[in-house]
Amino acid sequence: MARFFRRRKFCRFTAEGVQEIDYKDVATLKNYITEAGKIVPSRITGTSAKYQRQLARAIKRSRYLALLPYTDKHQ
């Protein structure tokens, strides 16, 4: 029976030495929301707890300022 080996998840923000996640950096934030507009959990992305909190706060701020949509297209 074949086993599947998954790559170990790591926090990209820790690896890059990011101090604070900026809410104006929409390109980075888009990688951490789904097509439906939900915030992707850290168990999927591998983001550490510290940066997951900053990420959620930044996404919510950018949504409030209309830099990111709350959902995708309403139809």
Swiss-Prot record:
Q: Which GO terms label this protein's molecular function in UniProt?
A: small ribosomal subunit rRNA binding; structural constituent of ribosome
Carries keyword Membrane? Answer: no
Biological process according to GO: translation
Which residues, if any, are the signal sequence?
Answer: none
Q: Which HAMAP family match?
A: Ribosomal_bS18
Function per UniProt: Binds as a heterodimer with protein bS6 to the central domain of the 16S rRNA, where it helps stabilize the platform of the 30S subunit.
Quaternary context: Part of the 30S ribosomal subunit. Forms a tight heterodimer with protein bS6.
- The protein in question is named Small ribosomal subunit protein bS18
Q: Which organism is it from?
A: Vibrio campbellii (strain ATCC BAA-1116)
Output the lineage of the source organism: Bacteria, Pseudomonadati, Pseudomonadota, Gammaproteobacteria, Vibrionales
